[in-house]
Amino acid sequence: MRDVAIIGYGQTKFGELWERSFRSLIVEAGVKAVEAAGIDGKDIDEMYVGNMSAGLFVGQEHIASLIAEHAGLNPIPSTRVEAACASGSLALRQAVLNVASGASDVVLVGGVEKMTDVVDATSAISSASDQEWEALFGATFPSLYAMMAQRYMYEYGLTLEELSMWSVIMHENASKNRYAQFPFKVTLEQVLNSSPVAEPLRLLHCSPVSDGAAALIVCEAEKAKEFVNKDDIIYIKASVQASDTIALHSRESITSLKAAKVASEKAYKMANIEPKDVDVAEVHDCFAINGLILMEELGFCKKGEAGKIVYDKKIAIDYDGFPAVNPSGGLKAAGHALGATGIRQVGEIYWQLKQDKEVKDRQVEIKNGYGITVNVGGTGGTVCIHILSDKR
């Protein structure tokens, strides 16, 4: 298998982008990635697009061909990948496998979602849950994650203040991100006093409905040198996917994500590193509780310890001795445009590891040269993890 690298990244702003169309978002992100990589459309061999539900959100299926057309890339192969909120990272995984196998040298991989063009976004999002045993009985993702939070509080003594500090830190980080949906700070009191959604979750514990797109250029490592300087090449050391039950009630435990633990252990082994070697992480904090759980599944701390670590702000950008978590602001504050999220996460790590000027106001200290992303579909039915490094 060949070594695989990222040589360019681009994204749109995330938010309620009423004036933008689905197709214009992904084309903007793709053009930015192509320009950043210093390549031309004719250099691209294939394209993958992560998208959860364009059919429900904008009434458009067959989007892979549509996007290739509007990007001026026909007749290259173009494939859509769907795995709920993990669609973007699974699209990237397919691109990585494609390049590693020798099938292609340069692949454009993007993610996009336009969520504000539908009246009932909640119903569309709920299509990623078990329709017979969850959605049919009125369960929504806020209610499912609320059950996870309640049980976690019961088992480990997590306080609402500890949980809420997650949101405070995410908004602090997002205030330094010009692409973030919520680029402003919030106080602990504001989080605690925000509107109840599903006990114990408040509004400011939840990620928003978002429009947005992101794109990466994935390239064979030797060929990458033809396009960019060596400092702009970041290597993909691991790309791992794992699955679990879609329905939350079918799990052995609702305070852990087994697929995340399995995938992270395999990814660390593939990259030949340990959790302590990670400088920076982007985790799937669709709800604050998931951020805490994923810290534990990634091996950053023991079970039940994440709340205190977060409350002590050890995950902050400027804290020394613990991986910085979600310098972008995470899903919570940077935004969660479903199919684009997995790509955006990897794009942030790419920028961080090469210390790009785009992240100068939120730059993490890079000591070991490793970053990790974890992207989750549903309540953990699909998990995809990528480890990136500035070392080949």
UniProtKB/Swiss-Prot annotation:
Residues noted as binding CoA in the record, renumbered to the chain:
C206, S207, V209, K332
What is the protein's quaternary organization? Interacts with HMG-CoA synthase (HMGCS) that catalyzes the second step in the pathway and with a DUF35 protein. The acetoacetyl-CoA thiolase/HMG-CoA synthase complex channels the intermediate via a fused CoA-binding site, which allows for efficient coupling of the endergonic thiolase reaction with the exergonic HMGCS reaction.
Signal peptide positions (record): none
Show the GO MF annotations: acyltransferase activity; acyltransferase activity, transferring groups other than amino-acyl groups
Database matches in Pfam families: Thiolase_C_1, Thiolase_N
Q: In which pathway does it act?
A: Metabolic intermediate biosynthesis; (R)-mevalonate biosynthesis; (R)-mevalonate from acetyl-CoA: step 1/3
Q: Does the keyword Manganese apply?
A: no
Q: What EC number(s) is this enzyme filed under?
A: 2.3.1.9
The UniProt entry annotates the active site at: C85 (acyl-thioester intermediate), H336 (proton acceptor)
Protein name listed in UniProt? Acetyl-CoA acetyltransferase
Instruction: Give the species this sequence originates from.
Output: Methanocaldococcus jannaschii (strain ATCC 43067 / DSM 2661 / JAL-1 / JCM 10045 / NBRC 100440) (Methanococcus jannaschii)
Quick check: keyword Acyltransferase in the entry? Answer: yes
Q: Which GO terms describe its biological process?
A: isoprenoid biosynthetic process
| Family label | Belongs to the thiolase-like superfamily. Thiolase family.
